[in-house]
């Protein structure tokens, strides 16, 4: 095995290890032909110093004293490589690294050097001195260079005269790298300065003594266990034994994920079980999540104190949930600046005590200027960038693929730890970034011949196949990677035509799925080292899981996964340190038990759980502060909030959870007011039977069924707003003065059988939009309760009060399940509870359609003056809506004419403002989905046969459609949702709309 990318296993230790080291060191250092030449040169230099008393030296002071001369003055000049007598000047490795190897096990190079030194000692006269005392620059704070003094058996004093730039030298035996030759310990006395030169007086004792002090033992420096980036915390990039990796795992043995009494299986079964346990171990604890949230809050407070209108967003691994315990936090500040205020923010962060000045670095010359800092209290590392919205878009894209491939996150976390140990996880050091690694994993799963869409796949087999593909099979020279449109491998010649600025494809060419022409792996110049590491890992794991079991590995005793990855003692100590010092941030206060399969809650606030522990161990945090209940705007909204879908303005304002077939939540965010679709099935047919009790309600239902095709495809607002909402219209909701933080981590098995808290309704938005099917896709009878305000209002006035109360009670039971939580069976993308062919889960047959429909598009920040203009526009539209509530009875022809005008207006709208495709859904920044509404052609055909109750006019359309609406500056919201919301598929609704249209014809 190549020791530069891995380490030796237990079965490799023995007599053959020294031979292997000798072969490797001879070949790697190219010492075969040069070793004799170097030794001869060293012998020649030593012979010349015996006859003449002059030697050359640069950073090291070599004082060679000859007893034939009583007072010997030595002039020191330049020598860039160190001690000449030990044959070290021509070695490429530092001597301290070789000494660490010697402390563990002597290699061939050290043995040869010792033999040569012994021969030199035997060939010299007794009156020549060959003692070496080396003081390392790291052991003394007064000198950066090492001082070497050679004195032996001489009663006379020798003085060395340094150049004008020399300083006072100190010689200590503690930092020396002594040899086995007879030596005397030289004690340095006071140094006297004469003119421009520095005179150093050394006295020596006559009795010969041998002193050997390992430098690696004396230079032990204590580091805070939270510091991630340390040169010695790597297992690759240098020899395994050169960086004391065995000492780094001596305390906990490097395998804390293994369960002592667990019966691990043989081969790939045991490897799969270990990967599962590793994933469970590295998941963040509630305390670790809390400290990260506190760090984000402190930095966000500083940013808002400087720029009240700025927006702070989280992206990267903390947003996607694919972060290790020592990973950093990636933040982006969105605002309007002519010049990025890097130095301003740096000064404020240091002056307010967020970070120490020595830990803050401003990389203003980088392609993406960032501020790197380490939080003073928690030692969490943070990277802050400005106006880089591509990171948020990439995070949302990764979260989408996490839902499509449940095994993705487990595979990625193992690979990230694998590259971290080998120092191959940073682009500026030649490695590959986390984003590149995730895209490689996505491409691997997309191109897998078996089609990995379920979470029951063997992770051990997948890990082996990943190492085999990118370590042995993949052609890095000619092939590029693309994950768009279902994924493919493409020739680099084809990619070069699309590259921006005429750049050639890099060695690791990965097409950016969000920015055409951008190469993600362009800066990874050390791809061959990564390939070599993958290749080595494949060989190690293949031998370990082989059915022949040639290595004699017992999986119940020896770890298979531990042969390629370890968790160092520093990481384990850091997690324990976090738990001991910051456990007060998570107040354990158990409340009443939740329904079956529901999360366990901690630290409730106003009845809503603050922290939720998922069954897999993942942490979901809902609130930092208590939600503020906004008073009811008018009685009509409160009276009909259940029967007509008019949301209470302050009802559950802060709860972030949403499922695919239930009413979704609307949270006020700093960057966007998210409008989601709610689908409540089960009581639609009974409601239609109740409405058929009277002739008037029967006629109203016919009108309602005619207009259903317009609301069926993802409309989220009232009847006069359906066309606007499906085009990504932004609605500004009521803002509160409290800070809301919504954090949810993904679960390993998706959200198929997980209960969620009660959904939230937006201010002025419908609470439900239900449909039901008859099982064969034909003759679907739909009810758009809450979609058309005036129709629902008229029906409510004509309805008997008892029927209305019964309807309200039924809808409340269907929505809340009686316990305030959605039933597990309600969760699923594209499922129809009223019938039809919905499966309640993901429809993986439509994967290519989802991939071909495009990706998440991030919108932009809008200044407050434009927000006020948009608010006025929304206010005028609400006025027109209320006006039509009271005056549109019997004006069917007028509504029909107005609907055609509005339809014609939307057909002429620019296509770039339309969001989504027929089978596409989007995720908002806060984790709540935005249901994209079908194609424009289907929209026009469906809406042409329906009567509209629209109460808006051209003033209803804001001038900045498709842009983000920032809330007031007092609102501060951070959304880090990963799996807490799943958008319902619009494909089923589109098919239902087409079937309804055929029935009407």
From Swiss-Prot:
**One Pfam family from the record:** MTPAP-like_central
Which reaction is this enzyme known to catalyze? RNA(n) + ATP = RNA(n)-3'-adenine ribonucleotide + diphosphate
Question: What InterPro entries does this protein map onto?
Answer: MTPAP-like_central, NT_sf, PAP_assoc, Trf4-like
Say which enzyme class the record assigns. Answer: transferase
Q: Taking every annotated instance into account, which residue ranges of this chain make up the domain PAP-associated?
A: 458-517
Among Gene3D superfamilies, the record links this protein to:
1.10.1410.10, Beta Polymerase, domain 2
Q: Which PANTHER family match?
A: INACTIVE NON-CANONICAL POLY(A) RNA POLYMERASE PROTEIN TRF4-2-RELATED (PTHR23092:SF15), POLY(A) RNA POLYMERASE (PTHR23092)
Task: Quote the protein name from its UniProt record.
Answer: Non-canonical poly(A) RNA polymerase protein Trf4-1
Classification of source organism: Eukaryota, Metazoa, Ecdysozoa, Arthropoda, Hexapoda
